[in-house]
Amino acid sequence: FADNSIDLIFSNLCLQWVPDLPAALAEFRRVLREDGLLLFSSFGPDTLIELREAYLQAGERHPPLSPCAAIRQVGDAMIAAGFRNPVLDRDLFTLTYPDAMSLLRELRAIGAGDARVQRPRGLGGKSRQARMIAAYEALRHEDRLPSTWEVITAMAWAPGPGTPRREGNADVASFPADRIPRRTR
């Protein structure tokens, strides 16, 4: 898309699969018009925390689940991309399942696996899965297993051309080259 060509960007529960959130937000800022609105939701790090912990207790050093950015990381990335007036919120939802396999089947059905490029490869094996299920079963309450989902919602506005943005520890201003006055003799 061309620079400054879009009025609104809306993304619902997709950005957690993006391997480089700051780069995605910088691209959003590039294509949004002045005063364009960015609205999105994404999962946070407490999503599937029970399942992650069960994998860790089963001896899995790297649970086969994608990591999710925390609300502070999301906000920092929005500011670094140059968005103004960011507003973020987080909500925790707990869904319950009759067993761990029902949760795993649902995750597989929605394509929610490990999206990391550098994820460990190979099969986990039935014994690892059995250990994870045993660890998860310890959380059973009223004949159901809990599954926490942290949802981060965010909105921000695109500033006008020439508004500084953060890159590292410096503010960087940019403006169209045709606005540079020319002196003629």
Predicted regions and their residues:
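Structured loop/turn residues at beta-strand edges in well-structured enzyme cores
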Residues: N4, A81, S147
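Residue-level recognition of oxygen-bearing side chains
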Residues: D20-A23, S102
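C-terminal lobe and adjacent flexible extensions of AdoMet/dcAdoMet transferase-like proteins
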Residues: M101-R185
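Short catalytic micro-motifs in class I SAM-dependent methyltransferases
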Residues: L13-W17
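Conserved catalytic/acceptor-binding region of the Class I
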Residues: L37-S102, E106-L123
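A short acidic, Gly/Pro-enriched loop at the edge of an enzyme's catalytic core
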Residues: F1-I9
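A short glycine-rich, Lys/Arg-flanked "PGG" loop and its adjoining helix->strand segment in the class I
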Residues: P22-L37
